[in-house]
């Protein structure tokens, strides 16, 4: 049975800065408590990641995934190959500019676990993933914006 979750957050930065933070997959473990390792396997000609290998840990479950990224002007999507812990995973970040320096970010994840997971563990994992994907991203972007302003 597929599990879905989503969350929106407003970040005080333009979409291109947010997409830049998402493209910097090597730094993801520094702002996402879910990610333990992330490495780019190959990239698109523009330098953005195409395939990425990540190790994640959520609610005591550890998994290594190979993600295939697709990029648009205001979105990024990735899908995971089948692993020991899941049959499939689909993630979307959709960005909507509200003002010059303010963007609404919507994060959506659909995951099909390879085995049944108790509801209390699903709820705990859902909260942790949604927080890392939105608030963690916000902290990372705001750090980037602050350091750019001080230059």
Language model features with spans:
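Hydrophobic ligand-binding cavity/cleft-lining segments
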Residues: 1-47
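Flexible, active-site-adjacent loop/turn segments at secondary-structure boundaries
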Residues: 9, 26-29, 59, 109, ...
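A short glycine-/small-residue-rich loop at the edge of a beta-strand within enzyme catalytic domains
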Residues: 9, 56, 128
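Hydrophobic pocket/interface hotspot
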Residues: 18-22, 28, 52, 105-107, ...
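Short acidic, gly/pro-rich beta-turn/loop elements at beta-sheet edges
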Residues: 19, 30, 48, 62-64, ...
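Hydrophobic-ligand binding "helix-grip"
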Residues: 29-30, 37, 44, 55-104, ...
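A conserved amphipathic terminal alpha-helix motif
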Residues: 110-151
């Amino acid at each position: 049975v597929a599990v879905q979750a989503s969350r929106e957050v407003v970040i005080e930065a333009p979409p291109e800065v947010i997409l830049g933070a998402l493209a910097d997959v090597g730094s993801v473990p520094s702002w996402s408590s879910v990610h333990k390792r992330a490495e780019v396997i190959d990239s698109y000609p523009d330098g953005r990641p195409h395939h990425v290998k990540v190790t994640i840990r959520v609610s005591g479950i550890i998994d290594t995934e190979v993600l295939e990224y697709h990029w648009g002007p205001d979105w990024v999507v990735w899908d995971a190959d089948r692993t020991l812990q899941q049959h499939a995973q689909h993630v979307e970040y959709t960005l909507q500019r509200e003002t010059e320096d303010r963007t609404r970010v919507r994060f959506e994840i659909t995951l099909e676990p390879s085995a049944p997971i108790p509801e209390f563990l699903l709820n705990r994992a859902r909260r942790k993933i949604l927080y890392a994907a939105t608030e963690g991203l916000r902290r990372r972007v705001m750090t980037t914006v602050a350091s750019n302003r001080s230059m």
